[in-house]
C-alpha cells in the first residue's frame, strides 16, 4: 500500500491506455513488416487509425499500373525503359528504338532499379509484396547470361507477377509459362509448336 491507500500495482486509466496503444502499435508494426517492404511512419499511423482489416482492404482497392492506360502509373517495364533512357541516352534515344539489341550488360541493373522503386515507393505495397513472394515460387534467374542481358524480359516478368498478384492462379501460371523470361530460363524460347501426325 502507498501512503494514500492505493496499491502500488494498480493501474491508472492513463497507463492502461498507454499499454493498449503500445499493443496496437506493435500489432500494426508487425502487419507492416509482413505486408510491405518495411514499415513507414505514415503507414503505421494509417493502420492504427483505420485498423488492420481496413488497411488491407484499402491496399487491395488501390489502382495499379495494370488497371487502365493513361492513369500516370507506370509498369515495371515502362519504368525500366525510363531508367535505361536516363542511363544511356545515346543507346535508347527515342521511344521506337528496340531495347537490348546490343546486349549491354547493365540492363538487369535497370530492371532491379525499377523493381526497387516500386517495392519501396508504390502505394499498393501488398501487391508488390505478394508479387515478390510469387517470384520466390515461380523463379527466373538474372544469373543466366541471356536473362541478365535481357532486363526488359525480367521487368515484364515482374509485371506479370504484380498484375496477377490478386488474381486467378491459373491465369498467372499461363502468363508465366509464356513469358520471355521463363522461355529464356527454361530454354523453351523459340521451340516449334508440336505438330500432330494425324
Residue ranges and their predicted role:
Residues 1-113, 117-121, 125:
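N-terminal module-boundary/linker segments of secreted carbohydrate-active enzymes
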Residues 42-44, 48-49, 99-198:
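Primarily short, surface-exposed interaction patches in extracytoplasmic proteins
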Amino acid at each position: 500500500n502507498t501512503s494514500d491507500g492505493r496499491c502500488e500495482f494498480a493501474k491508472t486509466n492513463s497507463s492502461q491506455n498507454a499499454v493498449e496503444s503500445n499493443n496496437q502499435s506493435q500489432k500494426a508494426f508487425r502487419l507492416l513488416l509482413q505486408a510491405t517492404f518495411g514499415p513507414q511512419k505514415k503507414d503505421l499511423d494509417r493502420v492504427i487509425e483505420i485498423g488492420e482489416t481496413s488497411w488491407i482492404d484499402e491496399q487491395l482497392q488501390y489502382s495499379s499500373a495494370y488497371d487502365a492506360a493513361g492513369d500516370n502509373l507506370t509498369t515495371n517495364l515502362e519504368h525500366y525503359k525510363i531508367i535505361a533512357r536516363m542511363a544511356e541516352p545515346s543507346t535508347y534515344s527515342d521511344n521506337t528504338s528496340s531495347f537490348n539489341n546490343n546486349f549491354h550488360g547493365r540492363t538487369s541493373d535497370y530492371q532491379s532499379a525499377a523493381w526497387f522503386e516500386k517495392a519501396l515507393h508504390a502505394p499498393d505495397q501488398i501487391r508488390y509484396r505478394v508479387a515478390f513472394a510469387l517470384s520466390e515460387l515461380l523463379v527466373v534467374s538474372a544469373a543466366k547470361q541471356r536473362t541478365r542481358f535481357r532486363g526488359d524480359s525480367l521487368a515484364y516478368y515482374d509485371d506479370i507477377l504484380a498484375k496477377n498478384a490478386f488474381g486467378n492462379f491459373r491465369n498467372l501460371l499461363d502468363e508465366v509459362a509464356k513469358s520471355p523470361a521463363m522461355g529464356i530460363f527454361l530454354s523453351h524460347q523459340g521451340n516449334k509448336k508440336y505438330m500432330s501426325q494425324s
